[in-house]
From Swiss-Prot:
Catalytic residues, chain numbering: 74, 139 (proton acceptor)
Pathway: Amino-acid biosynthesis; L-lysine biosynthesis via DAP pathway; LL-2,6-diaminopimelate from (S)-tetrahydrodipicolinate (succinylase route): step 3/3
UniProt-recorded name of the protein: Succinyl-diaminopimelate desuccinylase
Enzyme class (EC, first level): hydrolase
Organism in which the protein naturally occurs: Orientia tsutsugamushi (strain Boryong)
UniProt cofactor note: Binds 2 Zn(2+) or Co(2+) ions per subunit.
C-alpha cells in the first residue's frame, strides 16, 4: 500500500520551499537527496545567463523502457498574502484538504510521483527497465533554461526516454476525466496604429487612430480562423488591452495601441497567423507597427501504444473514462514532442494559481494509484493493478 502519510509529508515539505519561479530555493536539492537515498543516479544541471536555473535528471534501473516522470517545482507568486486562509508556503492540512501555493500546480503531483515510485521500487525488485525523473525550476516563467535545455543535455549523454508522464493539473471535475496529449500554440501581438493628433471639435483636421483600431479589432474578432479538427478546438483570438495614454477629453490622440493573443491549433503556423493579421490591418491603414512573439507552437504527442495503454489504465484505476484533450494553456510538454511520447496527467486544475490553492487528499491518493499502476503496466511482465 502506498503510504498516505508519506504522500502528505512529502507535499508539506515541498510546499515549505518558497520556490517562486525561477528560484527553486532548495527544493531541487531536497528532491535530489530523496532520490539518491533511494538509489537513483542523479544529475543536477544549471543553465542560464544572468540567473542560473537548477534542473535535475535522475534514473534508477537499467535498459528500456525508460519511463520518465516530469514536472516543475517552481510556482507563481502567492499574491496578496492577507487573502490566504493559511500561510501559502506553510502547507496546512484541514479536514480533507491541503492548502498551499503550488499544491495543485504542481507539487502535489511531484509528491505523488515520488511516493508511488518509492513504493514500486520497494515492492518490485525484478522490474525490467528504467524509472527516471526530470524536474525543473523554470516552467512558470520564461521556460528558457529548464526542460528544454535539460532534454538536450540528457540526450547528449546517450539517454533515451520511451514514455513521459508530466504531472500538470489536467483534470476538470474528477481525477481521471482528462489526459492532455497536446497543447495549442500561443502567439502575442502588440499593435500600434498611428493617426494625426488634433482637436475633437475639428475632426476633419485630424486622423483618429481609435476609430481605426476599433475597426481593425472588430474585423479580427469576426474573422473565423478555422473550424478545429479531431484533437483541437477552433483557434481563438482574445483582445487583452486597448490604450491611447490619453486622459484629455478634447484631444484626438496620435497613437492607439492594443495587445491581443491567439491560441491556435496545428492547422496553422504562427507565420500564417501573422500574415492574416497584417492583411486585416491593411484593409484599414498602412500606418501601423505590429510586433509579435510566439512562445509556443501547437503540438500533438506521438500517438504510441504507451498513450492508449495509459488511457485504459486510468479508466481501470479511477473507474472514469478519460478524454484526450489539447485544451488549456502552454506547458513543458511541448519540449518532449521530439524526444518521447508524452501524456499530461495530474490533479484538478480548478484551483491552480488561485488564492487559497488546495487539493483533496483523496485526489492525491488516486493520482498515486495511477502512477504506481503505470509502472506496473510498463515495467512488469506480469502486471497486476493495485486499488490501494
Amino acid at each position: 500500500m502506498i503510504s498516505k502519510k508519506l504522500i502528505i509529508e512529502l507535499l508539506k515539505q515541498l510546499i515549505s520551499f518558497k520556490s517562486v519561479t525561477p528560484n527553486d530555493n532548495g527544493a531541487i536539492d531536497f528532491i535530489t537527496n530523496l532520490l539518491v537515498k533511494q538509489g537513483f543516479k542523479v544529475y543536477v544541471k544549471e543553465f542560464g545567463q544572468e540567473y542560473k536555473v537548477k534542473n535535475l535528471y535522475g534514473y534508477f534501473g537499467n535498459g528500456q523502457p525508460n519511463i520518465c516522470f516530469a514536472g516543475h517545482i517552481d510556482v507563481v507568486p502567492a499574491g496578496f498574502i492577507e487573502q490566504w486562509k493559511y500561510p501559502p508556503f506553510c502547507a496546512t492540512q484541514y479536514k480533507d484538504k491541503i492548502y498551499g501555493r503550488g499544491v495543485v500546480d504542481m507539487k502535489g503531483a511531484i509528491s505523488a510521483m515520488l511516493s508511488s515510485v518509492f513504493c514500486f521500487i520497494d515492492n518490485n525488485h525484478d522490474f525490467n527497465g528504467t524509472i527516471s525523473f526530470l524536474i525543473t525550476a523554470d516552467e512558470e516563467g520564461e521556460a528558457l533554461f529548464g526542460t528544454k535545455k535539460m532534454l538536450e543535455w540528457i540526450y547528449r549523454q546517450g539517454h533515451k526516454i520511451d514514455f513521459t508522464i508530466l504531472g500538470e493539473p489536467t483534470c476538470t471535475d474528477k481525477i481521471g476525466d482528462t489526459i492532455k496529449i497536446g497543447r495549442r500554440g500561443s502567439i502575442n501581438f502588440d499593435l500600434k496604429v498611428f493617426g494625426k493628433q488634433g482637436h475633437v471639435a475639428y475632426p476633419h483636421l485630424a486622423i483618429n487612430p481609435n476609430h481605426l483600431i476599433v475597426k481593425i479589432l472588430n474585423r479580427l474578432i469576426a474573422y473565423k480562423i478555422d473550424e478545429g479538427n479531431e484533437f483541437f478546438a477552433p483557434s481563438n483570438l482574445e483582445i487583452v488591452s486597448i490604450d491611447t495614454n490619453n486622459n484629455i477629453t478634447n484631444i484626438i490622440p496620435e497613437i492607439a495601441k492594443s495587445k491581443f493573443n491567439i491560441r491556435f491549433n496545428d492547422i496553422h503556423t504562427n507565420e500564417r497567423l501573422l500574415e492574416i493579421v497584417k492583411k486585416t490591418i491593411e484593409q484599414f491603414t498602412t500606418n501601423y507597427d505590429l510586433q509579435s512573439s510566439c512562445r509556443s507552437r501547437p503540438f500533438l504527442a506521438k500517438m504510441s501504444p504507451y498513450i492508449f495503454s495509459f488511457k485504459e489504465l486510468v479508466h481501470k484505476v479511477t473507474k472514469i473514462k478519460p478524454e484526450f484533450s489539447t485544451s488549456g494553456g502552454t506547458s513543458d510538454a511541448y519540449f518532449f514532442k521530439d524526444y518521447s511520447p508524452i501524456v499530461e496527467f495530474g490533479l484538478l486544475n480548478t484551483m491552480a494559481h488561485k488564492i487559497n490553492e488546495y487539493c483533496l487528499i483523496n485526489d492525491l491518493q488516486t493520482l498515486c494509484r495511477v502512477y504506481y499502476n503505470a509502472l506496473c503496466l510498463f515495467l512488469m511482465s506480469n502486471s497486476k493493478f493495485r486499488t490501494n
